[in-house]
Regions:
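Conserved ATPase-coupling elements of RecA-like P-loop NTPase cores
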Residues: 16-20
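Active-site phosphate-binding/coordination module
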Residues: 21-118
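Residue-level detector of anion-binding/catalytic polar loops
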Residues: 37, 170, 226-227
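Short hydrophobic/aromatic-enriched beta-strand-loop microsegments
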Residues: 59-65, 135-137, 227-232
Length: 264
């Protein structure tokens, strides 16, 4: 049976503190040798993922900005993808709203709800909050669908969620930021649509694995055959009600390597 691997990045494939993936080397080699699509499924932007793929040495489909869109390299595995919209050198399936719509809401509510969005932060502030380097910050600000933000007053969260609902938007929590996004998108919906697409392309059922560590990964974990939680940097685990959930023994990329080797 064909397989797909969906993976979160920060705190899962990448270590929380230094963004390293060195300890995943053995599993990466096994995935490449087996020809299994490794689908980064992340809150990161297209620019961020493309740069990371270059460093990892892969050219695979990927899901960006918390399930907002799936990008597939043109001609991937020889598939005819002409039925999908073209975006640069990729084909795209869009699940989210435009960044302009998201920013309209953010700017209306940022003061009354004590939000500080990525679009308002200086590069220096983002470096301080994330530990990213200057180049990575530039990539992170090239957004198409969602706005990450810091909530200075947590008591405003419920009111903010209600307001977002009236705009057909929602608020979700990632590893470092909250995110404003379309009400009708999440990693789970993107995973479902991606699995359906690959089953059509392969003309057979596929087996799916997902690895994550944060609240915004739960929807992804709920819709795969083998859901895996990676131990957090502080030694805790994401709490879920997902049946048959697997847990890594190690944190970050070492835990990712451990679990991928177990199932690929």
């Amino acid at each position: 049976m064909k397989r797909l691997i969906f993976t979160d990045l920060d705190g899962t494939f990448l270590n929380h503190h230094n963004y390293s993936f060195e300890e995943s080397f053995e599993a990466l080699q096994k995935i490449k040798a087996a020809g299994v699509p490794l689908i980064f499924t992340t809150s990161k932007t297209k620019a961020e993922v493309e740069y990371l793929q270059e460093k990892v040495g892969i050219s695979e489909p990927f899901i960006v900005e918390n399930g907002a869109a799936l990008f597939i390299p043109e001609g991937y595995q020889g598939f005819d993808l002409s039925f999908l919209e073209k975006y640069d050198d990729k084909r795209i399936m869009v699940f989210g709203k435009s960044y302009a719509k998201v920013l309209e809401f953010y700017r209306r509510y940022k003061e009354r709800c004590s939000m500080a969005g990525l679009s308002d932060m200086s590069d220096e502030e983002i470096v301080h909050l994330t530990g990213l380097n200057q180049r990575d910050v530039i990539h992170a600000k090239q957004r198409d669908f969602t706005e990450p933000f810091i909530l200075k007053d947590k008591t405003k969260l419920e009111a903010l969620k209600k307001s977002a609902h009236t705009y057909e938007l929602k608020i979700t929590k990632g590893g470092r930021f909250y995110h404003i996004m379309s009400k009708f998108q999440d990693k789970g919906i993107a995973v479902i649509k991606t699995i359906e697409l690959f089953e059509d392309l392969y003309h057979e059922r596929v087996s799916s694995i997902a690895l994550g560590d944060s609240e915004n990964d739960i929807a992804m974990l709920e819709h795969v055959d083998i859901p895996i939680v990676i131990k957090k940097y502080d030694g805790s685990y994401l709490e879920t009600n997902v049946p048959h959930i697997q847990k890594s023994s190690y944190q970050g990329s070492k835990g990712w390597n451990e679990m991928v080797l177990k199932y690929v």
